[in-house]
C-alpha cells in the first residue's frame, strides 16, 4: 500500500496539476501558449480512470493534487514555460527577420 501511494504521489507530482483546472482547459486550443495543457489532460484521464476503479483512491489523488506543494510546483512550471515560450517566439521572429534581410534581400 505504501508503494502504491508513493507511485500515485510521483505521478501527480510529475503531471503537476490540479484536477479542477484540468476540466477547464482544451487540448486543441491553438491560441493557448500553455505547454501544460497535455499533462493536465493526461492527469484528468488518470484521475477519471482511477476514480472509476476506486473512488477512495480517486479522492486520495484529488487531495494530493490540491496540496500546496503540488500547486507551487505547477505554478513554477507554468511561469517557466511561459517565459520559455516567449523566448522561443522572439528567437523565431529574429530568425524570420534574418532570413528576410540576409537571404531574400528584403
Curated annotation (Swiss-Prot):
Q: What is the official name of this protein in its record?
A: Apovitellenin-1
Tell me which species this is from.
Gallus gallus
A Pfam family that this protein carries is: Apo-VLDL-II
Description of how the protein assembles with itself and partners = Homodimer; disulfide-linked.
Source domain of life: Eukaryota
GO biological process assignments: lipid metabolic process
InterPro entries in UniProt? Apo-VLDL-II
Organs and tissues of expression: Produced by the liver, secreted into the blood and then sequestred by receptor mediated endocytosis into growing oocytes.
Gene Ontology cellular component annotations, sorted alphabetically: chylomicron; very-low-density lipoprotein particle
Kindly state which keywords UniProt assigns to this record, in alphabetical order. Disulfide bond, Signal, Storage protein, VLDL
Signal peptide start and end residues = 1-24
GO terms (molecular function) for this protein are: enzyme inhibitor activity; nutrient reservoir activity
| Protein task | Protein component of the very low density lipoprotein (VLDL) of egg-laying females. Potent lipoprotein lipase inhibitor, preventing the loss of triglycerides from VLDL on their way from the liver to the growing oocytes.
Q: Give the UniProt family note.
A: Belongs to the apovitellenin family.
- Expression triggers: By steroids (estrogen).
